Amino acid sequence: MTKLADMKCEACQADAPKVTDSELAELIRLIPDWGVEVRDGIMQLERVYKFKNFKLAMEFTNKLAELAEEEFHHPGILTEWGKVTVTWWSHSVKGLHRNDFIMASKTDQLLG
């Protein structure tokens, strides 16, 4: 299987399939630091990244913004002193699509 971080997001429309339960179980293992949250009935991926200060958190946020623009897929981002909370889900399908797992993996690579 190709590494998630090496994959590209595909255009996603309202009729695109959400990940199945078996796909979810397989994909979540590839991004072990991420959790699945359900908000307003919508499944989402979420991770909190820790930093030594606000400046480093903001630098990470800006790198993530650039990545999101490159891939045309945008997360929820909460930047605070010493941490950034990133939430991925596909608004168009109101849940999780393979793109969200690709972007979670790419987000992890921003730390390296």
From Swiss-Prot:
The keyword Lyase applies. The keyword Protease does not apply. It catalyses: (4aS,6R)-4a-hydroxy-L-erythro-5,6,7,8-tetrahydrobiopterin = (6R)-L-erythro-6,7-dihydrobiopterin + H2O. One of its GO terms (biological process) is tetrahydrobiopterin biosynthetic process. Its EC number is 4.2.1.96. It is an enzyme of class 4 (lyase). GO terms for molecular function: 4-alpha-hydroxytetrahydrobiopterin dehydratase activity. Disulfide bonds: none annotated. Gene3D superfamilies: Transcriptional coactivator/pterin dehydratase. Keywords: Lyase. HAMAP family: Pterin_4_alpha. Belongs to the pterin-4-alpha-carbinolamine dehydratase family. This is Putative pterin-4-alpha-carbinolamine dehydratase. The lineage of its organism: Bacteria, Pseudomonadati, Pseudomonadota, Gammaproteobacteria, Alteromonadales.
